[in-house]
Amino acid sequence: MLGVAAAAVQIEGAIADEGRAPVHNDVAGLASAAQNVGGLVTADSSPDYIAIENYYLFKQDIERLAAMGVKYYRFSIPWTRILPFILPGTPVNEQALSHYDELINFVLEKGMQPALMLYHNDAPFQFYGGNLTNLFIAPGTGGIGYLDSCFQCSYKNVSFEDAFVNYGKIVMTHFADRIPIWWSFNEPILASRNGRSINAVIKAHARLSHFYHDEIKGTGRISLTLNDNFGVPRNPQDPADVDAADHFNSFQLATFANPIFLGIDYPESFKSSISDYVPLTAEDLAYINGTADFFSIQPYTATVVSPPNDTIAACSANISHPLRPYCVTQQTITTTGWNIGYRSQSYVYITPTYFRTYLNYLWNTWKTPVAVTEFGFPVFAEQEKSQRDQEFDSPRSQYYQSYLNEGLKAIWEDGVKFVGAFAWTWADNWEFGDYSQKFGIQTVNRTTMERRYKKSFFDYVDFVESRRQKS
């Protein structure tokens, strides 16, 4: 699997067209900076209303990707476009099904394979009861993620879990004959408020996996995608730093991966910090085990990890500790005094050596083929550059080529089953509040909506094709 990825809420626009109901990001965009307590919306923010108008321009976009030799096209479908009233038994938006029928068929016609994310950071607004006061999860408040996607919520006495499974079944039933790769959730830990949120995600995923494989006899593969700015110990010779990195990675990954891939309980890193976690019974674990066909990870960058000033245990026991929930110190400076890598516009640093180590860690821990379903690099200050300078994005090329090169070493020298990579993202788009963090391998003129290829797109494709084994 070698392809590109994007999410509906970041590219489609058309937020009120053809039956789509609001999602939390739409409504957050209406909030003033004064109403938003420490979240994504500021006085300088831009909403997602238009994005890059992919909903209308999808054929043009697919043509451009196919012309470059892309093999897999990862996209998402908004729940509220398929089911505007979100609940089981409410009307299905046939116009939306027709739209995605046309999109999927066009992807196939152009020689690519569609790969579908069912939920990518676009929670139906109905679950919030008209109140987004608690949308953002402030540090030191006992929450887990950054933004509450209401996985633990209910609407009209129907849980998010049950409503999401109903939506997923509708989409799978309609498109399973043409889509070979599926994901249930994107980076759910970042959107989880508490232990009940985690429980709802894991069980909803397992139910949809069983539906896909057991009930409709789907022949493709399904997973959910996890995130982890992979933690590396500040000093690999210091046991305390090693333990802190292990704690950090375990919390982010094993919380989901232990039950789903190994059929075992949540890790102690999670249970010691999240007091309201929902215990998993033996029956739960038997049902959840084996419900993902590959390990889907989005390892954009490494982060340097060390213990907190007190202890991990003390932090875990203190609900208001500012380092919760991970209870470690994260930084970008190594013991040499140097940055861990070349810096981007955001949190991403170019850290390819650690990428190889991380692939080994994932493979050796969970013994499941690993797919990198997002990785990308927003070049520093690209927003301020001329069009021609934006197109000549050598740091992004270096990022992709160096990571893929280390991935090949992991395959051929280490024996890791590294089975796929999806570049994030195929065009500059809405980055949850603004357009200044440019992850794209194409530029977008937001007045004319013209797309132009960047150098990194050619370099990404050339790297892959020049090393592709002939069948």
Regions found by a protein language model. Name each.
Residues 53-78, 113, 290, 294-295:
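Catalytic domains of carbohydrate-active enzymes, especially glycoside hydrolases
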Residues 3-37, 85-87, 97-471:
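Active-site region of glycoside hydrolase catalytic domains
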Residues 58, 93-96, 100:
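Generic structural signal for well-ordered secondary structure
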Residues 22-63:
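Aromatic- and Gly/Pro-rich amphipathic surface segment
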Residues 74-76, 81, 451-454:
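Short, cationic motifs built from Arg/Lys/His that form the positively charged side of catalytic pockets
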Residues 77-92:
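Glycine-rich, proline-tolerant flexible connector loops at the mouths of alpha/beta enzymes
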